[in-house]
A protein has these predicted regions:
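DNA polymerase processivity clamps
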Residues: 1-154
Length: 154
């Protein structure tokens, strides 16, 4: 299942209620990105590398050392697949991020979420320092995915 299809399913109730708007669906085919927004946050989704197989459900212990080393290395910033961008007034959470065009961009973050295949990593920025909140591996069950992601999307 492709990422925007999954997200539309996860957010279908909110979409139906008009709380969320899906932007740039054509960009999915051209650039591999879909933008979803509401009044509180902007979600930029890198779509092409996120495919899920819902054939099994398995949660494993995280590999934090690998995650931290990748996040600390700015040259590996392409590992960031899914970012939750808070309002610009949250300047105490300012950090530097390489966006999908490769340009250095300063954005205020609350949560950083990394979705790679069936792996979910959620960071919270505290004074420009990313703190691991949750990591789940081999999450291929839709209900488990919803349970993990939904609290961070409200």
């Amino acid at each position: 299942m492709k990422i925007f299809e999954l997200l539309r399913d996860v957010l279908k109730d909110w979409l139906r209620q008009g709380e969320y708007t899906v932007w740039n669906m054509t960009d999915y085919e051209e650039n591999g990105f879909v933008t979803i927004t509401n009044n509180k946050a902007l979600y930029l989704v890198e779509a092409k590398k996120f495919l899920l197989d819902f054939s099994k459900m398995e949660l494993r212990r995280p590999s934090r050392k690998i995650i931290d080393s990748c996040l600390a290395d700015k040259s590996k910033s392409e590992i960031i697949r899914f970012s939750h961008i808070e309002q610009p007034q949250d300047l105490e959470k300012l950090c530097v991020f390489t966006d999908f065009e490769g340009k250095k961009t300063e954005i205020a973050y609350n949560y950083l979420k990394y979705f790679d295949l069936n792996r979910i990593i959620i960071y919270e920025y505290r004074k420009d320092h990313p703190v691991l909140v949750y990591e789940y591996e081999d999450v291929t069950n839709e209900e488990v995915l919803r349970a993990i992601v939904m609290p961070f999307m409200r």
